Every structure is written in C-alpha cells, then in structure tokens.
From Swiss-Prot:
Its EC number is 3.1.3.11. This is Fructose-1,6-bisphosphatase class 1. It comes from Sorangium cellulosum (strain So ce56) (Polyangium cellulosum (strain So ce56)). One of its GO terms (molecular function) is magnesium ion binding. It is found in: Cytoplasm. GO terms for biological process: fructose 1,6-bisphosphate metabolic process; fructose 6-phosphate metabolic process; fructose metabolic process; gluconeogenesis; sucrose biosynthetic process. Binds 2 magnesium ions per subunit. Substrate binds at D131, G132, S133, S134, N224, Y257, K286. Pathway: Carbohydrate biosynthesis; gluconeogenesis. One of its GO terms (cellular component) is cytosol. NCBIfam families: PRK09293.1-1. It catalyses: beta-D-fructose 1,6-bisphosphate + H2O = beta-D-fructose 6-phosphate + phosphate. Belongs to the FBPase class 1 family. The gene is fbp.
Length: 347
C-alpha cells in the first residue's frame, strides 16, 4: 500500500446551518464567550419574540380593526398609525419582563423609556417599531428596525447620554420585514449577517439566508426622485449620471423604489446597488440616526457594503440628540463610493 499523500484531497466544506432555529443560532454564537452570562442571548431571543408577536398583529390587522390612524402624533410630528402603537407597546412589554434591557429609545416616544434600574441590566435598545407605517393601509411591506448597545457603565439605571454614541458601538442590529413571509435579518458584527424566515405553523424562525454578502457593485438604484427639486446639485448630477446609457460601465441602472425603508434596504442588501435618502438643499436628512441609519449601517458593513451620509461614515457619526435626522446612503461599496465622489465634487 502506497504511503504517498493524495494531494488532490481537500477537507470538506463546513456544513451548512440552513434550517437551524434563531434560538440555536444565538446560543451557538455565545459558545465562543465562556464568560457570557446569558443576558445577551436572552435579549436577542426577546427581540425574536417581539417579531413573532408583531407578525401576528400585522397578519390580522384588517380583521382586528388596527388599520388606520389613532388621531395622535408622535415626536416626529407624524400621525400615529394604530399598528405603530401596538408594535411599540408590544416591544416595551416584552423587553421589560426579564430585566436585561435597561432602557429603550423608540421612534414612537419623545423621551427615553427606562425599563430597569437593576445594575445587571447591561443593555439598551434603539428601535423603530414599525417603519413604513404610511404603507400599512395599502398592504405594502413594512418592518421593524433595532439596534442593541451596552450600557455605558454599571450604574443603577440608564440615561439619555448612554444612547448618544456612534453606531460603531452597537453590539447587534437587525430588522424584521413583514412581507409575503416574515424575515428577520440580524448581525452581531463579527459572525456575519444572517436571515431567518418565520414558519407560523410551528412558531419558529429558521435560518434561510446564511452569511449574506452584498455584491461589490449592483445594477439598481433606489431613491425618491419626486424630491429631486429639493436635492443639492451634486446629488442631481449623480442621479443623471446613473441613468446615462453606458454599457461598458453597466449603466443605466434600473430604478427600484417602494417607499418603505426596510423593503428598499433589504432588496439592496440581497441584490446590490444603492439606496439613497439624501439631504435636501438645507443639508438636512430625513432618516433618524439612532434607530434607522445606524442599525442599517451596522448590517451593511457586516455584509461587506458601505453606509454613508454622502460625506462621512454613518457608524462614525456621534448623535447630538435622540431623534437626530441624517442623510443616508447604503449599498454596494463601489456604488456608494461613486455617490461620495459626486458629493465631494470629484465628478
């Protein structure tokens, strides 16, 4: 028998984890942290439970009389939809049960909501409970966006200053897309970006999109061109350029815009290209830094993409207030770099 090695042999690929539950994925992720107390695992599982409960509400919205407006306005000056209120109260109720979350900043609340003064409550959560609520009555996909931070120190409770930190301090971020099926996409930054599809027959999220990676360049752009009269000249020049006919450079790009941030960003994450909600001429953006821009920036960078205001990296921006608004550009790295070059006047 020959003792010569077979140089053509290669070790088998790591087995796919497609089909594992969200709970199993979270538990496996903690195996590399021997000192883990279980608090982070429990908090992420609570967010998964919120997604299940809101899914149930969304599915029965028309029958349960929770479509339409409450007549109230939130801190953003937006008329509150009934489902917005339901989603927000569901999240606060679930996160307040186990004492792992010290406080929450929500789009629906003017101020920080303190949930626990126990020093063992190490985490704080930022959330848009139901993004795209203007689409609720017309049955277009909507979503939940969240981010998790560690509390600044072991003091008894949290205060608003705990939240005024750059997105690079996030320890987890994700979103839930309520569409033809419910999909939860989550990352802890280090282990990649993974998507879990909800199976209502067994009440579990199962891994369906493993290690999502955004393409280096895409072929679509997502922007509300109805606002073009309000854009700065550099954004208008970029918008005209991306629609020019140049086959060698892969242009024109196709337009894809729903008007629901979670839906538009999700498609961009999977297919590549660029999503942009630029500043108007005054320099003001529309999307909230803490619970919209930063979580998506954290997700896109973990998937190999880029996220920018057009002038600076989103994850480096320090919030000045809980509900600060910023411009947001997300997408394939080369597409975002093209946009930034126009903003800098290099094109």
């Amino acid at each position: 028998m020959s003792d010569q090695r077979d140089l053509s042999w290669k070790p088998p690929d790591a087995p796919s984890r497609i089909g594992i539950t969200l709970e199993t994925y979270i538990l496996e992720g903690m195996l590399g942290f021997p000192a883990a107390t279980g608090a982070f695992t429990s908090l992420l599982n609570q967010l998964g439970l919120v997604a299940k409960l809101v899914t149930s509400k969304v599915r029965r919205a028309g029958l349960a009389n929770v479509l339409g407006y409450t007549g109230q306005t939130n801190v953003q000056g937006e008329v509150v939809q009934k489902l917005d209120e339901v989603a927000n109260e569901t999240l606060l109720s679930v996160l307040g049960r186990r004492g792992h979350c010290a406080a929450v900043v929500s789009e629906e609340l003017g101020e920080m909501r303190l949930l626990s003064t126990d020093p063992r409550a190490k985490y704080i959560v930022v959330v848009d409970p139901l993004d795209g609520s203007s689409n609720i009555d017309v049955n277009i996909s909507i979503g939940t966006i969240f981010g998790v931070l560690r509390k600044s120190d072991a003091k008894m409770g949290a205060d608003p200053s705990d939240f005024l930190r750059p997105g690079r301090d996030l320890v987890a971020a994700g979103y839930v897309l309520y569409g033809s099926s419910t999909l939860l996409v989550i990352t802890t930054g280090l282990g990649g970006v993974h998507g879990f599809t909800y199976d209502p027959t067994v009440g579990e999220f199962f891994l369906s999109h493993e290690n999502i990676r955004i393409p280096e360049r895409g072929s679509t752009y997502s922007i509300n061109e109805g606002h073009s009269a309000r854009w700065p000249e550099d954004v208008r020049r970029w918008n005209a350029w991306i629609k020019e006919d140049s086959k060698p450079e892969g242009r024109p790009y196709g337009a894809r815009y729903v008007g629901s941030l979670v839906a538009d960003a999700h498609r961009t994450l999977l297919k590549g290209g660029i999503f942009a909600y630029p500043a108007d001429r005054s320099g003001q953006g529309k999307l909230r830094l803490l619970y919209e821009a930063s979580p998506f920036a954290f997700i896109f960078e973990a998937a190999g993409g880029k996220a920018s205001t057009g002038a600076e990296r989103i994850l480096d921006r320090v919030p000045r207030s809980l509900h600060e608004r910023v411009p947001l550009v997300l997408g394939s790295p080369r597409d975002v770099e093209d946009f930034e070059q126009f903003v800098r006047g290099e094109r």
